[in-house]
Amino acid sequence: MASRRRTLLKVIILGDSGVGKTSLMNQYVNKKFSNQYKATIGADFLTKEVQFEDRLFTLQIWDTAGQERFQSLGVAFYRGADCCVLVYDVNSMKSFDNLNNWREEFLIQASPSDPDNFPFVLLGNKVDVDGGNSRVVSEKKAKAWCASKGNIPYFETSAKEGTNVEDAFQCIVKNALKNEPEEELYVPDTVDVVGGNRAQRSSGCC
């Protein structure tokens, strides 16, 4: 039976409410942006098929609520993550100052096997707002924070204009692969019509 081997990568996006987590995800997956803000309730996710270095992956991107009342949901959603994306608004110092809290909460609730080397990526979003005149967090300050956390990759993005979104997620995929478990999805290309049995998806270790 012919089958395609496909790896599932789970990515979590964290940050304060309103920094543009949902917009970044929609821009990357659907190439769409909406000016209408709607707070995420609990958590939601989108998937995208991506090819990287001649391999096929299913990227599962989880968008979690930034409101404190939903943070207790973290354990269920964070476990099994291959990469964590931290997002702040370059026009909001508070959202930047809260990055430490989001990072620590993820490490506590996700309990990765190697927390010191778990892959994070930082995105400074909304660089397009007011032509950059409303900016309060400098690129230098953001890069210094990344350096203090083990040289976390950093991108300045605009979900509205699509600036650096594709490049950021390529980096996210690359970093997620460093944490990839030895487990893959087997997606059958054929169905056993004669026997009347639909080929089943199964997972296993390679």
Swiss-Prot record:
Highest taxon above the source species: Eukaryota
Disulfide bond sites: none
GO cellular component: plasma membrane; vacuolar membrane
GO biological process: protein transport
Subcellular location per the Swiss-Prot or TrEMBL entry: Cell membrane
InterPro entries per the UniProt record, alphabetical: P-loop_NTPase, Small_GTP-bd, Small_GTPase
A Pfam match: Ras
Topological relation to the membrane, as annotated: Lipid-anchor
Keywords, ordered alphabetically: Cell membrane, GTP-binding, Lipoprotein, Membrane, Nucleotide-binding, Prenylation, Protein transport, Transport
Principal subcellular localisation of the protein: membrane
CDD domains the UniProt entry points to: Rab7
PANTHER family attached to this UniProt entry: RAB FAMILY (PTHR47981), RAS-RELATED PROTEIN RABG3F (PTHR47981:SF4)
Family note: Belongs to the small GTPase superfamily. Rab family.
Function noted in UniProt: Protein transport. Probably involved in vesicular traffic.
UniProt name for this protein: Ras-related protein Rab7
UniProt source species: Cenchrus ciliaris
Lineage: Eukaryota, Viridiplantae, Streptophyta, Embryophyta, Tracheophyta
